[in-house]
Amino acid sequence: MKTLLTLLCLAGTLSFAQQNSPQDMKGMNMPGHDMSQMSAQDSGEDADASAHAMHSMEGHHMDMGPHMKMTALRTPQAGDAEKAQQVVEAARGVMEKYKDYHVALNEGFKIFHPEVPQKQYHFTNYRYAMQAAFNFNPEHPTSLLYEKNGDDYRLVGVMYTAPKRFTEDDLNQRIPLSIAQWHEHVNFCAAPTGRKQEMLGPNPKFGLRGSIITHQECDANGGEFHPIIFNWMVHLYPLEKDAAQIWSVDRQHAD
């Protein structure tokens, strides 16, 4: 199930770096997800697990309820708008640079599960993901967000990540929380071996849309509980015309 790690990795990138320990480096396969303790016997289901996790995230954010945590929108403070605009301007430079997705691939971005049909494809740079665990560089987003058009990809946005250990005050230092709302995925019960397909079915117990939200309930059903599976993340759409669309929470939920 380490590929569930690889899949969940995309969104939250860098759980290992936030803990700063060799043990957590096993979680780098999936940005922001540390499932390093999973049994080796799960390895045969890696591809399925990845697809399940991707499916759970794809277009279902609004259904996640207790599986998603959003930062609170703060009262604007002096300098917030200017600071956020600096991030937007840097992101626009990124958009121009990587408009051709081949450039992104040549510079180390990897398509996250290209074999899984998605509304939006994350091209993830794991070196930038590592950097994001320690400092914030808006010119180095963890992921580039592309929409597929035939055999081509159209760049529509970027994704920044931050360690799951960060407080909201820490996140506010990166991008003011009066402007942007970060989110993380929580209360994840991984399905036991042989039952991964259940995460894709109707009324699932397991996964990001599952009914199980507590450690006790997960144990009782043979699953493996993870209080947080991704690092903090925020999507930014810098080519939009106004701040509401650039930092759109609704679009972030839907993507």
Regions found by a protein language model. Give the residues of each.
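Histidine-centered metal-binding segments
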Residues: 20-70
